[in-house]
Amino acid sequence: MRLARTTACVLGLLGASSLSIVVFAGPAIGKASHAGWPSINGHLKMHKTDRSGTIRGSSRSDELLGGHGNDVILGGTASDVIWGDYKPCCQPTHQHDVLLGGNGRDFIYASHGYNHIEAGAGNDVVHGHFGHGKIDCGSGHDVVDVSHRSRHRYKIRHCERIR
């Protein structure tokens, strides 16, 4: 994947002890690494701290990555890849994430905590192997991948296929 530029952006300073940083990298050109994912031709946006915050997608296909805090991640109008928590270790179960796919064929991955997921329009794929909460697939022909262990922890609506 080739990145044109990388910029660190301070989203908010709410007093001396609260700072949220999101890294914007892009526009990216290329194919993301997982089979079936859209070509990421928008931005890579991620929470680099464990603070709570909001990430908004663009009109292009973006990869939007939340951290260990309480994240609100809003997909844009194209096909996006959304992660409730991208960090591979120390997965907290106390976080509360809101993951909204928007239009397009979105790929959404739940965090280990509480997840409120609305996939939106498009033929979306939602992965709820971890955590608990609500998954509403919205319109389109959607697929939810959820482990047998986690299935009873989610209230699942409007999903054409659960596997």
Region spans (language model):
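Secreted/luminal cysteine- and crosslink-motif detector
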Residues: V10, C90-Q91, G138, E160
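Secreted/extracellular small peptides and ectodomain modules produced from precursors
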Residues: T7, K87-P88, I135, R157
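Secretory targeting and sorting signals
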Residues: R2-P27
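Leucine-rich solenoid repeat scaffolds
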Residues: H129-R163
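N-terminal segments that cap or nucleate solenoid repeat domains
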Residues: G26-I82
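Glycine-centered beta-turn/loop sites at beta-strand termini
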Residues: G42, K48, G57, G66, ...
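All-beta strand scaffolds that present successive hydrophobic residues in beta-strands
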Residues: D50-S52, L99, I117, I135, ...
